[in-house]
């Protein structure tokens, strides 16, 4: 039976505006088949929820998560999941669109404090998923796809996350590559296949290093 690499994140992990996501070449290098749950516009709430649910009901051998920006949240409206982000406009096909837009506007004003609420939520989400995966014996690699930590972070959860399975916590990988390869990025800051192949190589090297250190 093939081993399964499960990936999750936002548009960067999904491979928006690129023919491929880094997930496919990474899984091929690891000799695995891939499942990519990433959703453009999705936040860290969704990453944790869908990763845990998938691992509870499916065989998973390795998890790669590219964390996204702090302010994104999930809400249930008309029995459906909707994904909030700063300035997000509700799609026209949503019933009672005006009511959901009022909620999003309220959240933009009062629920997006990056330095307290956003940071708190993100760290607890990451620690929750880390603990879940380790409890089930599933190997993993975390990295920041977009939005990085600063070195003066003061929170009791933060030291618990700092190991070789959280790659470059003080960097945001897709932001770094935009500085290195700006000609391969769209106006919406999405990398093309050249970026994704380079990131696949970098993540594979990190996974290989950490695997050798543990054997």
For every predicted segment, state its role:
Residues 52-215:
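Alpha-helical cap/lid subdomain in secreted, periplasmic
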